[in-house]
Amino acid sequence: MSQPELRDNRRVILDGQPQVRFRAAGQLFDRIPLANLSHGGCLAIIPFQEAGALCLDTPVTELVIFHPGMTANPITARVAWTIAHAEGDQVAVGLQFNDMAHDTRIALVAVVDSAILESAKR
């Protein structure tokens, strides 16, 4: 049996190689691949050996998304969840956005909505 969808926002997979940079738990995570993005958060894929300090509700600062159309203004967020299937695997880290500048919000909505429209055409 599958779990009901609890997320509030539709996730999209972006073209290209979107990445994110952020600080959390006293560490800088730089050029981390993004698996998906939404109006409310993103899914980062972090090497197991680097992700150990990230647990539920860890504050995230200075988050910047590297993708055409996004601004370089930092976003604050929190770790919403993490999952790794086995030691040594990469860790999927769900980040929930808390606060961002108005122009960053506008850019984020435009990027996500554009990806949704493109996927609907396929």
Residues covered by each model-derived region:
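N-terminal helix initiation/capping motif
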Residues: 1-48, 109-122
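Short, solvent-exposed secondary-structure boundary/capping segments
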Residues: 42-46, 83-97
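Short beta-strand-centered aromatic/proline hotspots
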Residues: 31-33, 75-81
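Short conserved beta-strand and strand-loop elements enriched in small hydrophobics
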Residues: 17-23, 56-72
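Hydrophobic core residues within well-ordered beta-strands of beta-rich domains
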Residues: 14, 73-75, 91
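Short, conserved charged micro-motifs
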Residues: 51-55, 106
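Short glycine/serine/proline-enriched coil/turn segments at secondary-structure junctions
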Residues: 26, 53-54, 70-71, 85-87
